[in-house]
């Protein structure tokens, strides 16, 4: 039910199972449906601090509060109870976050990584891609090909920003990129074969054509935020190595960084080969990192630094042994899938850096 609501932000009066999938049916405008969902979510969130339920509750209450003038007296009383429950649950999440502490893995400090002629980089023009490219280049890596995907006409997607965040307040011993440096400039140092595509999407046919499976052992993947890789690219290109911002299988889905800060007091990252099932590919490495210190940008800089560190760990293993780390297969019924975090919970998570 959480999944259905998170995807559509609607609660329907009926659902049916059709062809193995749950389909929405019936009315979705009755506020009693949202009140009842809110009550169920509040109960689930109070029973063990279940963050997916709290996140959905906050979004459900946004809908209810926007329609408050349309509620009758009984419905307003139920809404008032839910708002009191929301305040308790958010405060409990804040206190839980303040007491969270987790093991932190040391940074990767590899020497000269060397040449990887059968490895390519697929990089959307984002801050994270700049971090990956600079981390590899700074440690002496060269690749067989780099494919850069840009937005036509200067448009922007998730993961892109006109203003690069400052790294002046960074306090840990990780490689820190200069995100002002254009991606193309760094990629020219990584490979003699740089292809730039103005497709605006990873899922264009030209992308898969540029990264054939018979030419490369695998492709380091850094796409646009929020864009899922389509089946055609997965089937036609060499395997895509992705640094997921979450400790798998515990944290699948979206904005898992912030949920992890709330629950564990740490940032997890997992190196996986992408598969058709979201965040369920084989795992080749995992590391835990501290949340950002006060003054450090969490959306772009912190994310780029720590995912780049995991990438360096994987590539250092390949350089040293001639093989990627051993694969760990995930089970579909393990872990948790998260959805875009509500701004209230995101703010609490960000404050973890202020207290670090």
Predicted ranges, named:
Residues 2-11:
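N-terminal leader/linker segments that initiate helical-solenoid repeat arrays
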């Amino acid at each position: 039910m959480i999944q259905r609501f998170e995807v559509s932000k609607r609660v329907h009066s009926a659902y049916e199972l059709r062809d193995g999938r749950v389909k929405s049916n019936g009315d979705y405008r009755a506020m009693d449906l949202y009140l009842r969902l809110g009550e169920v979510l509040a109960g689930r969130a109070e029973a063990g601090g279940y963050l997916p339920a709290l996140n959905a509750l906050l979004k459900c209450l946004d809908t209810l509060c926007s329609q408050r003038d349309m509620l009758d007296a009984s419905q307003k009383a139920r809404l008032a109870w839910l708002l009191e429950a929301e305040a308790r649950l958010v405060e409990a999440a804040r206190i839980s976050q303040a007491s969270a502490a987790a093991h932190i893995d040391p940074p990767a400090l590899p020497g000269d990584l060397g040449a990887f002629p059968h490895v390519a980089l697929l990089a959307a023009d984002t801050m994270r891609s700049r971090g990956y490219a600079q981390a590899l280049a700074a440690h002496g890596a060269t690749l067989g090909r780099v494919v850069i995907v840009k937005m036509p006409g200067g448009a922007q997607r998730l993961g892109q920003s006109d203003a690069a965040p400052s790294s002046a307040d960074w306090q840990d011993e990780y490689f820190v990129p200069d995100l002002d440096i254009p991606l193309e400039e760094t990629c020219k140092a990584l490979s003699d074969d740089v292809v730039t595509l103005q497709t605006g999407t990873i899922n264009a046919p030209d992308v898969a054509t540029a990264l054939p499976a018979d030419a490369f052992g695998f492709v380091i993947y850094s796409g646009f935020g929020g864009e899922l890789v389509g089946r055609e690219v997965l089937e036609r290109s060499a395997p895509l190595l992705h640094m997921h911002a979450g400790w798998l299988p515990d944290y699948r889905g979206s904005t898992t960084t912030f949920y992890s800060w709330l629950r564990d007091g740490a940032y997890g990252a997992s190196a996986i080969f992408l598969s058709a099932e979201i965040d369920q590919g084989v795992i080749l490495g995992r590391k835990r990192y501290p949340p950002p210190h006060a003054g450090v940008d969490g959306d772009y800089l912190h994310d780029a630094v720590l995912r780049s560190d995991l990438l360096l760990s994987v590539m250092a293993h390949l350089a040293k042994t001639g093989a990627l780390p051993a694969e760990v297969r995930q089970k579909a019924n393990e872990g948790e899938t998260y959805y875009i975090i509500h701004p209230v919970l995101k703010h609490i998570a960000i404050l973890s850096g202020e207290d670090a």
